[in-house]
C-alpha cells in the first residue's frame, strides 16, 4: 500500500452545487473516482462556491461559520458541507457573505458581472482559510482554471504563514485557455498579493492582470485535459497569449485526458433510455432510433443515418460553420441524413439553427436549451454524433457517443484527436471547412448504408475504456511523482 496522500481540489463548479459547463462534471467525477481506488489511500476534499440554493440541496447543511481577514477586511464565511460519490468525498461550499447568491455564476444575459475579480478573489481567500478551520492539512492544492488560479500564489505567500500548515505542492489544471480571468490592474488590490506579483514574472499580462497566468507561473505542476491540447497551447494562437509562460514550464506541464462517468453514461442501465443495449448486445440501439424518428416526426420508410448534435452553441464548437454547411447542402437537396440538434448559447447561432429547421423541417429537428435526459436519448439513438469544434481541449461528448456506439464525426483537434481513432472508433474531418464537414458527413452516410463496417466500429468504440476510474490512476501517479519532486522555484524570490 502506498503512503496516504491528501488533496484539496478547488473548483468554481461541481455537481450538484452549480454547473455551467463540463468543469462541473469533471469536478464531481474525478474526486469520486480517486476516492474509490481500492489500493490507494487518498483523502480528497472539494472546495467550491456556495451558489444560490445550496442550503436546499439534499445532504448539504451549514456546518461552520468563521471570520477571515481578506482584502475587503474581516468577512464572515459560512461553510455548507455535503458529500460526493460512493466514497463520500467531502464538499465544502464556501460562502463569503452572499457573493454567489445571484442568478448566474459568472454573469447574466451574456455579460460578465463587473465585480467578478472581487468575488472570486475574496472566495479564494476564504477557501484557503478553510483547511485550518476544519482541521485538514492537504499535501496538494489542486486548482482548476482562472477561478481558483489565485490560490496558487496566494496560499504559500499570504495564507500559509498565518495558519502554519505543513509544506505542500500545488497543481493548476487548465480546461480551456480562452478563459483566463483578465482584469484591469486598477483592481489589483482585490488579489491580496504583494506588489512584486504585479510584474511580468507575476500576474501582469499586457497591461492588465491575468489570474490564470498567476497559476501557471507559480504552480509546482501545470496540467491540461489532453496531450493533444498541451501541444496546441505551447504555441499561438492556441496559447491565447500565454504560450510563452507555458513553454517556460514545459518540463512541469502534462496533458491528462478527462474521463466520463461510466455509471451515469451506461447504455445498459441508463434510466433515460426506453431500451437498453451493450457492446455484446448492440441491436436494441436501432429501436431507440426508430422511437426518436417517430416522436420527432421524421418521414418513415427511408433508410437514412441519424446525425446528432449535443453542444453549446458557440463559435468554439463550430456550430456556425456546421449550420452554414448544412444550409449549402440543403440548397442542393441533400443533408446527408436526418438531424437532431440540442443546444443553447449564442443568440445569433440559436437564430441560425432555427432558420435551418424552418427551411428543412422534415430533416432537421431542433431543441434550444439544456436538457440532460434528452441529451442521453439523442446520444443513445443517433448513428453519428457530429463534433466540429474549432478547438477542443478534451471534450466529453465524443466519449459519451463512443460509449453508446454513436460514432463521433470530429474535427481532429486537441482531445478529439486523442480520443477518436479515425476509421476505427469514429470519423475525422479532413479539414475544418464546408467541404471538410460535408465530405465527413457523406463518408458517414456511406458507412451507414454499407452496414457491415459500422457495426464493427460501434462495438470497437463501445469497448474503449474512457472511465474516470481509468483516468484517476493517471492522476494518482502524477500526484505521487509531484510529492517526490522539489517545489517549483518562485521566479520572484
Predicted regions and their residues:
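Catalytic cores of nucleotide-sugar-dependent glycosyltransferases that transfer UDP/GDP/TDP-activated
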Residues: 1-493
Amino acid at each position: 500500500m502506498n503512503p496516504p496522500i491528501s488533496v484539496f481540489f478547488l473548483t468554481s463548479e461541481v455537481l450538484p452545487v452549480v454547473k455551467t459547463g463540463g468543469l462541473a462534471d469533471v469536478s464531481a467525477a474525478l474526486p469520486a473516482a480517486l476516492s474509490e481506488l481500492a489500493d490507494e489511500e487518498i483523502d480528497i476534499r472539494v472546495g467550491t462556491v456556495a451558489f444560490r440554493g445550496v442550503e436546499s440541496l439534499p445532504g448539504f447543511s451549514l456546518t461552520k461559520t468563521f471570520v477571515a481577514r481578506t482584502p475587503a477586511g474581516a468577512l464572515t464565511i459560512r461553510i455548507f458541507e455535503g458529500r460526493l460519490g460512493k466514497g463520500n468525498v467531502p464538499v465544502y461550499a464556501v460562502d463569503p457573505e452572499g457573493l454567489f447568491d445571484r442568478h448566474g455564476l459568472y454573469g447574466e444575459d451574456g455579460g460578465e458581472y463587473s465585480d467578478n475579480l472581487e468575488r472570486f478573489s475574496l472566495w479564494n481567500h476564504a477557501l484557503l482559510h478553510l483547511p485550518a478551520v476544519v482541521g485538514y492539512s492537504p499535501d496538494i492544492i489542486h486548482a482548476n482554471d482562472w477561478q481558483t488560479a489565485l490560490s496558487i500564489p496566494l496560499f504559500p505567500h499570504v495564507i500559509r504563514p498565518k495558519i502554519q500548515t505543513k509544506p505542500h505542492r500545488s497543481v493548476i489544471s487548465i480546461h480551456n485557455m480562452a478563459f483566463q480571468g483578465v482584469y484591469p490592474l486598477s483592481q489589483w488590490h482585490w488579489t491580496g498579493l504583494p506588489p512584486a506579483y504585479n510584474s511580468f514574472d507575476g500576474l501582469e499580462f499586457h497591461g492588465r492582470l491575468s489570474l490564470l497566468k498567476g497559476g501557471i507561473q507559480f504552480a509546482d505542476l501545470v496540467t491540461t485535459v489532453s496531450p493533444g491540447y498541451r501541444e496546441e497551447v505551447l504555441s499561438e494562437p492556441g496559447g491565447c497569449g500565454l504560450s510563452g509562460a507555458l513553454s517556460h514550464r514545459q518540463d512541469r506541464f502534462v496533458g491528462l485526458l478527462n474521463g466520463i462517468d461510466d455509471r451515469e453514461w451506461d447504455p445498459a442501465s441508463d434510466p433515460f433510455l426506453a431500451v437498453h443495449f451493450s457492446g455484446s448486445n448492440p441491436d436494441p440501439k436501432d429501436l431507440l432510433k426508430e422511437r426518436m424518428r417517430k416522436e420527432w416526426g421524421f418521414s418513415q420508410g427511408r433508410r437514412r443515418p441519424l446525425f446528432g448534435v449535443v453542444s453549446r452553441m458557440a463559435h468554439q464548437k463550430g456550430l456556425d460553420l456546421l449550420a452554414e454547411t448544412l444550409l449549402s447542402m440543403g440548397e442542393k437537396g441533400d443533408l446527408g441524413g436526418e438531424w437532431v440538434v440540442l443546444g443553447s448559447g449564442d443568440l445569433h447561432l440559436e437564430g441560425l439553427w432555427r432558420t435551418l429547421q424552418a427551411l428543412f423541417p422534415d430533416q432537421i429537428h431542433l431543441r434550444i436549451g439544456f436538457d440532460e435526459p434528452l441529451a442521453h436519448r439523442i446520444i443513445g439513438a443517433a448513428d453519428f454524433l457530429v463534433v466540429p469544434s474549432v478547438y477542443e481541449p478534451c471534450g466529453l461528448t465524443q466519449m459519451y457517443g463512443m460509449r453508446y456506439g454513436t460514432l463521433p464525426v470530429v474535427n481532429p483537434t486537441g482531445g478529439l484527436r486523442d480520443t477518436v481513432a479515425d476509421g476505427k472508433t469514429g470519423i475525422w474531418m479532413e479539414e475544418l471547412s464546408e467541404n471538410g464537414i460535408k465530405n465527413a458527413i457523406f463518408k458517414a452516410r456511406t458507412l451507414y448504408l454499407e452496414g457491415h463496417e459500422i457495426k464493427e466500429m460501434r462495438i470497437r468504440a463501445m469497448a474503449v475504456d474512457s472511465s474516470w476510474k481509468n483516468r484517476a490512476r493517471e492522476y494518482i501517479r502524477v500526484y505521487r511523482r509531484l510529492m517526490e519532486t522539489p517545489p517549483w522555484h518562485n521566479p520572484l524570490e
